[in-house]
């Protein structure tokens, strides 16, 4: 598991350096095997089962494509993109004035996973799509997997 997380981190950071040989076309290069299928991955968090990663995939305003949050199972190497967040919440953790979910323009950048004082898991995601905000989500276990429930947002102060 640790090796897969390390390898995924190297793949995600692959564009940050200038290696002598690059993996292209999603083909292995020597002992390096890329994990393909992500779209502009930005950040990741290891979830409580120590096998699932939550990964932010930033959209592209240049091409009009939204981003997403995705789950990556490190054992089966499967990617599950979470649905767009269009449903309002029945409970708000962010600013009282933020009651509209990010919708289909959602484009997450950095993410953070933490446990709230009440014991529930919280995911914060910096959003650059549709609005500049920090979106609040509750991480929920569902069967043998996970899902996120939108719980509000924090918006920048207007000057």
Residue ranges: model-predicted function:
Residues 14-15:
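C-terminal motif of bacterial Sec signal peptides marking the signal peptidase cleavage site
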Residues 138-146:
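Short loop/turn segments immediately following beta-strands, especially the blade-tip
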Residues 68-115:
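Blade-loop segments of beta-propeller domains
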């Amino acid at each position: 598991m640790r090796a897969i997380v390390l390898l995924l981190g190297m793949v995600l950071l692959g564009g940050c350096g200038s290696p002598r040989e690059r993996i292209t076309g999603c083909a292995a290069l020597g002992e390096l095997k890329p994990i393909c299928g992500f779209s502009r991955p930005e950040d990741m968090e290891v979830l409580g089962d120590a096998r699932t990663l939550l990964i932010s995939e930033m959209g592209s305003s240049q091409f009009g494509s939204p981003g997403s949050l995705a789950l990556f199972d490190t054992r089966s190497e499967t990617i599950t993109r979470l649905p767009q967040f269009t449903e309002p919440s029945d409970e708000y953790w962010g600013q009282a004035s933020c009651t509209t979910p990010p919708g289909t323009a959602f484009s997450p950048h950095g993410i953070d996973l933490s446990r709230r004082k009440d014991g529930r898991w919280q995911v914060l995601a910096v959003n650059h799509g549709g609005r500049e905000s920090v979106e609040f989500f509750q991480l929920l276990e569902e069967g043998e997997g996970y899902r996120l429930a939108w719980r509000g947002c924090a918006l920048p102060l207007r000057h």
